Amino acid sequence: MLITRIIKREKSSKYDVFIDGEYAFTCDAETFFMLGIEEGKEITSEQYKYYVNYIEAKEAKNHAFRLLSRKMLTEKQLADKLKLKGFSEEAIGEAVSKAKEYDYVNDENYAKFFVEEKMQSLYSRRRIYYELLKRGVEKEIIEKVLESIYPHEKEVEVIRQIVEKKKNSHREIQKLKKYLYTNGFEIENIEKALNLT
């Protein structure tokens, strides 16, 4: 395999590389010089695969860091977004590992932030639990974070806040019980909160 042509893009630090007369890949200037790519250079198919895998892994990492600079994500959410972008499993694995290494992705920190935020929005423990499960956070992490930040006693307080907003009559109380139960609050906590108000 022969690198037959290299075109530097205008107004960009990217290079288009052609092998045996056909377009092969695009890379940035840093990668271009680091890999020692030059016109007329003979490369093996193993070198070609290495170049392509290296470039894809670097692009996946860069994309992951851009995503994480805008929004906190779980490992699963990050991997899913990279998969949607078309990156290979290997490149996704490298990107997620690098993000974890720099502590840009940390499911426990994500869970703590999520629980704090949703508690303020008067979510039940159960609803938060299932929302975090959907986002790929492990059960053990969710349980640990819920116990430390949102114990059952706090859920009773949250129920009281909801009750204060909605209670007027017996009929309203019954509707409220049903509302609270369908939103994931435990029946024992509902009864406690209603008896204490």
Curated annotation (Swiss-Prot):
Official protein name in the record: Regulatory protein RecX
Location of the protein in the cell: Cytoplasm
Cleaved signal peptide residues: none
Biological processes per GO annotation: regulation of DNA repair
Presence of keyword Mitochondrion: no
Source organism superkingdom: Bacteria
Pfam families from the UniProt entry: RecX_HTH1, RecX_HTH2
Function: Modulates RecA activity.
PANTHER family in UniProt: REGULATORY PROTEIN RECX FAMILY PROTEIN
Keywords: Cytoplasm
A GO CC term assigned to this protein in UniProt: cytoplasm
Major localization class: cytoplasm
Family to which the UniProt record says this protein belongs: Belongs to the RecX family.
